[in-house]
Amino acid sequence: MARVTDKITHLIKPVIEGMGYELLGIEYVASGKYSILRIFIDTNKSISVNDCEIVSRQLSSIFDIEEPISGQYNLEVSSPGIERPLFHKGHYQCFLGFNVKLHMFRPISGQSNFFGVIGSVSEINNTIELVGELGAIILDIDLIKKANLVVDF
């Protein structure tokens, strides 16, 4: 699935940035006619529904011409929300010390889901140290399928 999101990122990142927003990341969930293409945007001010609508209209026009995904799908443009998704190494670095929930592409020691605090990020090894109830574990960022901040209330 990385190829689809990479292609879309290349296509839309300059457009979104030209509109004054940051492209945080893309999720593509393939499920036949119920597939979802979710685009996360941010800015230094809060994202409104109107912001999402404006970006969605612009991207819809581009996708109608370029057709980066074959078949039907629903386009969703969203703010990161309170449980912000993390897509890149830089995102993990920005949120050192924060609680996260991770879902891996494949199990590691029989476990696919992890919860803990981001302890450190290694530039050299492309890994994060996740500190949880059972201690620290080093995880390869490329093996993380989905990551979100977890907010404690």
UniProtKB/Swiss-Prot annotation:
- One Pfam family of this chain: DUF150_C
Q: What is its subcellular localisation?
A: Cytoplasm
Highest taxon of the source? Bacteria
Q: Which UniProt keywords apply?
A: Cytoplasm, Ribosome biogenesis
Principal location listed in the UniProt entry: cytoplasm
Q: Which HAMAP family match?
A: RimP
Protein name from the UniProt record: Ribosome maturation factor RimP
